[in-house]
Structure formats: C-alpha cells, structure tokens
Amino acid sequence: MSKVKSITKRTTQEVRQIETSLINKEEVFKMLALAEATGLPCLLIGAPGVAKTKTVLDYAKAWLNRDGKMTAKDFAEKIYILETDEGTKASEIKGMPDLGKLFTDNEYSLSTPIADAEIVIINEVDKASSAIRNAMLGVMNEKFLFNGKHKIPCKWKLFVATCNEIPKEEKNSPFWDRFMLKHTVNRVSAGEMIKYYNKGGREYREKFTIGIPNKAEINEVDIPVTKLEKYMEVGYNHSSDRTLTFVPTLSKAVSYIWDISVDKALVKTAQIMIDQTAGSELQNKLMSPEVKAVMSKVEMLHSYQTNEQLELAIAEIEGLVNTYATRGIMDSGQINEIEISMQYILQNHPARVDNVDNNELEELMSEVETSSPNPF
C-alpha cells in the first residue's frame, strides 16, 4: 500500500522523488530540501529511535537516484557516514595516508572519503571531541578539508549532523552556530502510530515529490526591507553577524519550498535559526492590527454553540477579508492561512459537523486572491 503526493506546489526544475516507510516526516524532508537548495549544513535534533538517520538516508536515495540510474556502488561511494563518540579520532575527518598508493606507487596521498562524498552524515555530533568538531568546521564552512599542508576541496551537496540534544553549556558555542538549519525530530504520537498500523505497518510506503528551487527560482521571491527590519528587531541579539547575512536568501527558499507567504517564511526562518519563541514574537510584529483582528475572530469560532452563530461570524470574517484584501492590507498568503484555520475549526466544530460546506470558503478565498496583490 502506498500514497503519492506532492509536498511542494510550486514548479521547480529540480524534483526529488522520495519513497519512505516512515510517517510524519514531511517537515524533516523539507528541511533537507532546504539544506540542499541553500547549501547550508543541517542539524537534526531528537531522541534515539526517532529515525533521524533513516530520514536522511531516504532523502539521500532520492538525491542519488535523481536520474533513475542509482546503483549500490553509488550509494556506497557517494555517502559518507561517521558515527562519533568520545573515542573517534580526528583522522576520521582529516583523512589517513593511502597505504595502497604508498606501497605500490611510492606516492604519498591522503584517503579522504569525506571530501569525495556527495552526502555527508555525522551522527551523534554532540558526543564528538573538540578535535573532531574543529576538523569539521572547514568541511562545513569553506567546503575544504585541511590537513597540514593539504587543502582538499569537498564535493558535498548535503551535509547533515544529528544529535540527541545540544548541551546546555554549549548553546552559545561557535560550533553550533555553524548549523544555521536546526530541526527537532519528534516522536510519532500514539494516535498516528495506530494509523500507521492500519495502513500496513512496516510494509507501508509513502511516496513524495518535493521541488528543489535553484538560485534563480529562489530570487523570484521578493522580501520587502520593512519586513527584514522586523526580523532584525527579534533576531539581532540572538544571531551572529555571519548568520544574519543568510536570512534573506534562507527566507526566500523557505517561502518557495513550504509554499507560504513571505511573512510566514520569515517566522519559520526565525524558528529554524533561533527558536519557537522568536518565531512567535516575529509573527506578532509582522501582523498588522487588521490581520490580528481577523485571526482573533477566527479563533473565536471555537466558542460559538450553534450553527447560526457560526454563520454570522463567518460572514463577518469574509467581509473583513474582502475589505482588507482590496485595500492591500492582507496578502494571498495570509488569506490562505485564514482559510486553512477556518476549515480546520469548522470541520471539527460540534455545531457544524453535519453542515460544513468547504466549497463556500474555497470560492470566497479564490475570488479574494485574484483581486489581492501578489506577495511575491
């Protein structure tokens, strides 16, 4: 049994076709797509057993098989996986003398599998020694492997590290700051696990397609300076200058891959680069008073007891959305978010379960979107 769907809606030249037996990993796959599109190292954080490495390997297979010609040899040669602990030596990163060439050709050279790999996975990086971490920095930042006089270019297209947690005493360490893309991989809920059993358990397969925007496609997204100023108000004291230089490009890529408005992309970027609290603070700053008022009315739908009360409230919200969209106060991304919130509330509302008509909302939002300014 399998399910095929597209994670991203926008058209891109590059597409990854992912097949996985994992469930509820769409956000992780999007993060890996973001890492590939931006060329930034990604850190996956989560408890043992949440399938951090398996998710990366499923994505790696999709990347290696993008032309449909992947072989077992490709998988073995183009992926470098390092399991680190306190005893792992820096030579695992820096490379070791190639004894074969030394004895057969009397030639000294380094065997550097990490430099040759197209996908690099460093597991349990929180347990790595300072020597390992220092050796990683050049590979991560400059894409060069430094070993004495040797400076070897690295070929990686996707660099992912995993850890159980970032040690509290190291949260402000420059090493962790190098991972601008951070994502927490959570456990699957008990309810979702039951659904997984009903779908066939370990025999179940999900298939995704996810678009990978190139530089030109990313730059199609326009982020007004006024919105970046709001980001700076929240993020400046939490980020290094180096990290802040990536905010515009990263936010554009987020907008593209998640197919969300610029405001939502900036909020998600803050969540990725800083934390959830920063994202919530930025969301509050980016919302105009008018949009906040509409969102508040949407949340109030929970409190109504009868279908008649809901109908009146919906009509009021629809009127406000039309007015604000016409005046350019609300963009299509915000309208879409309101639509999704309303549909979710109405589909689960006791007074509306037997009466909900999603078509009326979809028709309204479609009409409004055609008349509202394009946020991109």
PLM region spans:
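Conserved NTP-binding/hydrolysis module of P-loop NTPases
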Residues: 80-104
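Walker A/P-loop
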Residues: 33-85
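Conserved RecA-like P-loop NTPase ATPase core
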Residues: 24, 32, 44, 93, ...
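Canonical AAA+ ATPase core
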Residues: 63-69, 100-104, 119-132, 138-213
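Basic, amphipathic alpha-helical bundle interface domains used for macromolecular binding and assembly
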Residues: 189, 200-288
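C-terminal engagement/docking regions of AAA+ P-loop ATPases
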Residues: 48-54, 257-376
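Conserved alpha-helical scaffold flanking the Walker A/P-loop in AAA+ ATPase domains
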Residues: 30-35, 99-120
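Pre-Walker A (pre-P-loop) alpha-helix and adjacent loop at the N terminus of AAA/AAA+ ATPase modules
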Residues: 4-48
